[in-house]
C-alpha cells in the first residue's frame, strides 16, 4: 500500500530548493494535494513550476511565525514536511529573528499538527548540530559540539519533536542534512552558496576564491537524494528517530573546486584568501547505515555527476530568465 496516494501534504518552506524537489516527488508518488507555506524570502515561485504541472499545488504566502497562517495551512492535511528555516549566516546576523523562526515558528507547526491530528511530521535538521567532529565519520550518536545559533536551533527542534512525541504521540522523523547542492539552489540571492559563487567567477573568467587553506571538508549530497530521503522517512514505519542524510564521502574545498573547474571545462586556478569565520567546522562525513537499514535509503548521485546536473540547470535557468526579460518567452 502506498501511504502517500490520495493524501494532502503541507511543506513549510516548500518554495525552497529542497522543499520544491520534495513536492515533485510527493506528487509523483500520488499525493492528491501539496500545500506550500512559504514567505518567499528565500523560496522562489519558479521552483514550483514543475510541481504545478504534476498535480494540485496550493501556495500560501505566509510565515511560520504567524500562528493563524500556520494553523490554516495545517488544517486538513495528512502529513507535514517542516523545511522552513533561516540560513546559518542570517542566524548569526539576526539572533532574535533566528529564535523567532527556528523556535517559535517550529512550535507553531507542532501545535497545529497536534490540533489537527497530523499523521506524521518529517522535519529538516542539520549536520550543524555536530559542530567540529569528535570522530569521523559522524553517526547519529555523535555529541552535539555545535557552536552556532543555527545549530542550536536545530538541536532545539529535535528535542521539541521528541517532547511532542512523548506528550502527544505525534509521530516524526528528523533528518540531519549534510551539505546539499543541486538544481534550484539560490543563484541570485544575497547569500549564495560557495558553488554558485565559484560558477559565477568561472563564467566571468575569474579565479574561484577559496577562503582559508581549502582543507576544510564537507559531505556533499545531491538535492534529489535529499528529497528521496524525505519521502522515505514519511512512508517508513520509523518514528521518534533522527537520521543522517549524506553521501558518506568527505570532500575538501580544494577537491570540490578542482572538480568544478574540470566539469566546467576551465583552465583557471583557485585563488586563496584569508579564512572567514562564519562556520569554521573543519570536517564533515556522515555515516549512512542507519538510514539504509531503517528507511531503505541510500544517496546515489556522485559529486561529479551532480555538479554536471547543477551546471546544466543553471545554464538553462539563466537562459529562461534572459528570454523572459527580453519578452521572447
Question: Which sequence ranges carry the predicted segments?
Answer:
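Glycine/proline-rich active-site loop of Rossmann-fold NAD(P)-dependent oxidoreductases
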Residues: 155, 180-196, 206-207, 211, ...
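Conserved C-terminal active-site "lid" loop/helix of NAD(P)H-dependent oxidoreductases
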Residues: 223, 276-298, 302, 309
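C-terminal "lid/loop" region of Rossmann-like NAD(P)-dependent oxidoreductases
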Residues: 213, 242-243, 251-258, 265-283, ...
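Non-catalytic, hydrophobic alpha-helical segments
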Residues: 80, 226, 230, 245, ...
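Hydrophobic "lid"/C-terminal helical patch
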Residues: 22, 230-234, 257-260, 307-314
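A short C-terminal helix-loop "cap" of Rossmann-like NAD(P)-dependent dehydrogenase/epimerase domains
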Residues: 54, 141, 168, 196-210, ...
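N-terminal Rossmann-like NAD(P)+-binding domain of SDR-like oxidoreductases, especially those catalyzing
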Residues: 1-180, 301, 317-320, 327-329
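Conserved mid-core alpha-helix of short-chain dehydrogenase/reductase
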Residues: 69, 108-112, 220, 225-228, ...
Amino acid at each position: 500500500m502506498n501511504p502517500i496516494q490520495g493524501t494532502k501534504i503541507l511543506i513549510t518552506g516548500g518554495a525552497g530548493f529542497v522543499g520544491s524537489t520534495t513536492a515533485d516527488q510527493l506528487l509523483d508518488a500520488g499525493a492528491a494535494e501539496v500545500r506550500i507555506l512559504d514567505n518567499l524570502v528565500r523560496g522562489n515561485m519558479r521552483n514550483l513550476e514543475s510541481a504545478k504541472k504534476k498535480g494540485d499545488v496550493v501556495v500560501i504566502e505566509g510565515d511560520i511565525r504567524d500562528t493563524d497562517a500556520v494553523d490554516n495551512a495545517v488544517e486538513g492535511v495528512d502529513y507535514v514536511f517542516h523545511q522552513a528555516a533561516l540560513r546559518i549566516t542570517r542566524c548569526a546576523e539576526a539572533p532574535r529573528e533566528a529564535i523567532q523562526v527556528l523556535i517559535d515558528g517550529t512550535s507553531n507547526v507542532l501545535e497545529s499538527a497536534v490540533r489537527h491530528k497530523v499523521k506524521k511530521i518529517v522535519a529538516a535538521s542539520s549536520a550543524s548540530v555536530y559542530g567540529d567532529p569528535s570522530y569521523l565519520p559522524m553517526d547519529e550518536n555523535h555529541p552535539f559540539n555545535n557552536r552556532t545559533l543555527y545549530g542550536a536551533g536545530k538541536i532545539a527542534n529535535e528535542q521539541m519533536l521528541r517532547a511532542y512525541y512523548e506528550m502527544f504521540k505525534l509521530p516524526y522523523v528528523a533528518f540531519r542534512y549534510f551539505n546539499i547542492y543541486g538544481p534550484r539552489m539560490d543563484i541570485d540571492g544575497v547569500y549564495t552558496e560557495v558553488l554558485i559563487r565559484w560558477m559565477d567567477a568561472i563564467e566571468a573568467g575569474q579565479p574561484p576564491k577559496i577562503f582559508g587553506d581549502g582543507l576544510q571538508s564537507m559531505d556533499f549530497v545531491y538535492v534529489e537524494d535529499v528529497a528521496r530521503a524525505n519521502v522515505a522517512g514519511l512512508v517508513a514505519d520509523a518514528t521518534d528517530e533522527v537520521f543522517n542524510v549524506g553521501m558518506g564521502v568527505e570532500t575538501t574545498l580544494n577537491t570540490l573546486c578542482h572538480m568544478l573547474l574540470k566539469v566546467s571545462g576551465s583552465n583557471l586556478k583557485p585563488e586563496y584568501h584569508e579564512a572567514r569565520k562564519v562556520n569554521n567546522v573543519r570536517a564533515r562525513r556522515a555515516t549512512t547505515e542507519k538510514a539504509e537499514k531503517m528507511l531503505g535509503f541510500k544517496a546515489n548521485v556522485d559529486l561529479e555527476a551532480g555538479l554536471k546536473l547543477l551546471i546544466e540547470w543553471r545554464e538553462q535557468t539563466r537562459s529562461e530568465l534572459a528570454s523572459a526579460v527580453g519578452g521572447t518567452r
